[in-house]
Regions:
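Extracytoplasmic/periplasmic soluble domains downstream of a signal peptide or transmembrane helix
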Residues: 1-132
Length: 132
């Protein structure tokens, strides 16, 4: 199944909760990552909380589903393709050295399907947290 990058934050913590998963194989948990669109919700459940993250704007789209995105995150796109060595996508503020002031979820998987030539990255921002 999916696994958390060991140097990333835990779900709901300030910074970047980064998770890698396969697009093929048993269960293929991230097979449909490419279907996520701007403002789609991604729900993460822990033992004590249900955390909703929302996919950031893709390709410069307008995102009325956010109450403003902080300037430190204005460069972060909801979905893009990068190289396997681009570890900056898992930084506390993705692709930046800025200090985090929001909770971010980053999902990474191989791209294209059945290849490890590139990585598909999805970034989402926390919008709701509820106790179970």
């Amino acid at each position: 199944g999916p696994g958390r990058y060991v140097d990333s934050q835990m779900p709901g913590e300030m910074g970047n909760f980064a998770v890698a998963g396969h697009r093929v194989g048993k269960g293929a948990p991230f097979n449909d990552l490419g279907k996520l669109e701007t403002c789609d919700d991604i729900v993460v459940e822990t033992q004590t909380e249900r955390i909703t993250y929302r996919v950031l704007p893709i390709d410069g789209e307008q995102a009325d589903c956010f109450n403003g995105i902080p300037p430190e995150y204005s460069h972060v796109v909801g979905r893009h393709i990068t190289t396997p060595g681009d570890v900056s996508v898992t930084n506390p503020v993705p692709e930046s050295d800025a200090a985090p002031n929001r909770e971010i979820l980053t999902l990474t998987t191989c791209h294209p399907q059945f290849s490890n030539a590139e990585r598909m990255i999805v970034h989402a921002m926390e919008v709701e947290k509820e106790e179970k």
